[in-house]
Amino acid sequence: MNLHEYQGKQLFAEYGLPVSKGYAVDTPEAAAEACDKIGGTEWVVKAQVHAGGRGKAGGVKLVRSKEDAAAFAQQWLGKRLVTYQTDANGQPVTKILVESCTHIAKELYLGAVVDRSSRRIVFMASTEGGVDIEKIAHDTPEKILKATIDPLVGAQPFQGRDLAFQLGLEGKQVTQFAKIFTGLAKLFQDHDLALLEVNPLVIKADGDLHCLDAKINIDANAMYRQPKLKGFHDPSQDDPREAHAAKFELNYVALEGNIGCMVNGAGLAMGTMDIVNLHGGKPANFLDVGGGATKERVTEAFKIILSDTNVAAVLVNIFGGIVRCDMIAEGIIGAVKEVGVKIPVVVRLEGNNAELGAKVLAESGLNIIAATSLTDAAQQVVKAAEGK
């Protein structure tokens, strides 16, 4: 689960980390009032969405009057912000963060992820702040500094000081960086985070370090341990199809192709997408119906897939283990009839009673193509999507 910048900064402040004074508002009038509360003559206003690249898209602005702050809020509240990290529809803006202006001398990067290979939290730091860290890692990997956190003893101040020296920090900045480093590590562990970024972590004009941004992603599997953070969830930022799928315990991720995929098992689903792509097709989604491919779940899966108007054909790839393939076939037929599927549906069944399942599909009289293998299924659905 992603957090907004203002929510991330709330957590930063709870751990004593240096953040700008600011208020998240949802009306132009509140934006103007926030300027008065903060004080000063310059403020930064930021549209709050779960995506990067806001500045280049006009979603971040320096204003010098509370009227300009109100005008910015009027411009963006209720609108959708399109960035390089969103799709063409963008993300809805329901909050504006108004905060004090920070005068920057230098930008740094500091972030942390769970490294699956070492099974440790790994911190990354760089002198190249304010830009895409993936680009830095690709173009100049030597500029990425790393520190691995031992889960037994946690982050140690000496690790923070070591990173600080490598970043070229000096004097009080070294102590400040070590405090930020250990604070972020504690926050990461306390709240079951999957990713944390401060980009940029800045050196202000007076030489102090300051967390100018906050990007946080919480491990969805750990949400039951984080009741406080559940209230931070903003459903407006979710893809409506993905949110609908979650209600039925379906794992759905929207993509940009025209071939709908319905599979039981995440590994098989990824393999199915790969082979569709190998044969010249473009998957429209990832959809794992899980182990219980019942008629009800298959019906909902069809509804979700067909809500994407780009879908020209559907590939159903089911491996029958405990669940018999003939029962799955009957569920598919019932779902196709109930939903009123008008586009070609290619079905590949393998496993328990697969031959009987294929026979049931063939005798249904519906526009369902029974494939003999996964390769055949991919070839058939690509042809069907192309209208051949």
UniProtKB/Swiss-Prot annotation:
Cited Pfam families: ATP-grasp_2, Ligase_CoA
Pathway the protein acts in: Carbohydrate metabolism; tricarboxylic acid cycle; succinate from succinyl-CoA (ligase route): step 1/1
UniProtKB keywords: ATP-binding, Ligase, Magnesium, Metal-binding, Nucleotide-binding, Tricarboxylic acid cycle
Residues that, per the record, bind Mg(2+): N199, D213
GO molecular function: ATP binding; magnesium ion binding; succinate-CoA ligase (ADP-forming) activity; succinate-CoA ligase (GDP-forming) activity
InterPro entries, per database record: ATP-grasp, ATP-grasp_succ-CoA_synth-type, ATP_grasp_subdomain_1, Succ-CoA_synthase_bsu_CS, SUCC_ACL_C, Succ_CoA_ligase-like_bsu, Succinyl-CoA_synth-like
Entry's cofactor comment: Binds 1 Mg(2+) ion per subunit.
Intrachain S-S bonds: none
Domain ATP-grasp: 9-244
Alphabetical GO biological process terms: succinyl-CoA metabolic process; tricarboxylic acid cycle
Residues annotated to bind ATP: K46, G53, R54, G55, E99, T102, E107
Gene3D superfamilies: ATP-grasp fold, A domain (3.30.1490.20), ATP-grasp fold, B domain (3.30.470.20), Succinyl-CoA synthetase domains (3.40.50.261)
Keyword Phosphoprotein (UniProt): no
SUPFAM superfamilies: Glutathione synthetase ATP-binding domain-like (SSF56059), Succinyl-CoA synthetase domains (SSF52210)
Cofactor dependency: Mg(2+)
Catalytic activity: succinate + ATP + CoA = succinyl-CoA + ADP + phosphate; GTP + succinate + CoA = succinyl-CoA + GDP + phosphate
GO cellular component labels: cytosol; succinate-CoA ligase complex
EC identifiers of the protein: 6.2.1.5
The keyword Ribosomal protein is annotated on this UniProt entry: no
Binding-site residues for substrate, renumbered to this chain: N264, G321, I322, V323
Function, in words: Succinyl-CoA synthetase functions in the citric acid cycle (TCA), coupling the hydrolysis of succinyl-CoA to the synthesis of either ATP or GTP and thus represents the only step of substrate-level phosphorylation in the TCA. The beta subunit provides nucleotide specificity of the enzyme and binds the substrate succinate, while the binding sites for coenzyme A and phosphate are found in the alpha subunit.
Entry's family note: Belongs to the succinate/malate CoA ligase beta subunit family.
PANTHER family referenced in this protein's UniProt entry, alphabetically: SUCCINATE--COA LIGASE [GDP-FORMING] SUBUNIT BETA, MITOCHONDRIAL (PTHR11815:SF10), SUCCINYL-COA SYNTHETASE BETA CHAIN (PTHR11815)
Known partners and oligomeric status: Heterotetramer of two alpha and two beta subunits.
Protein name: Succinate--CoA ligase [ADP-forming] subunit beta
Biological source species: Pseudomonas savastanoi pv. phaseolicola (strain 1448A / Race 6) (Pseudomonas syringae pv. phaseolicola (strain 1448A / Race 6))
Gene: sucC
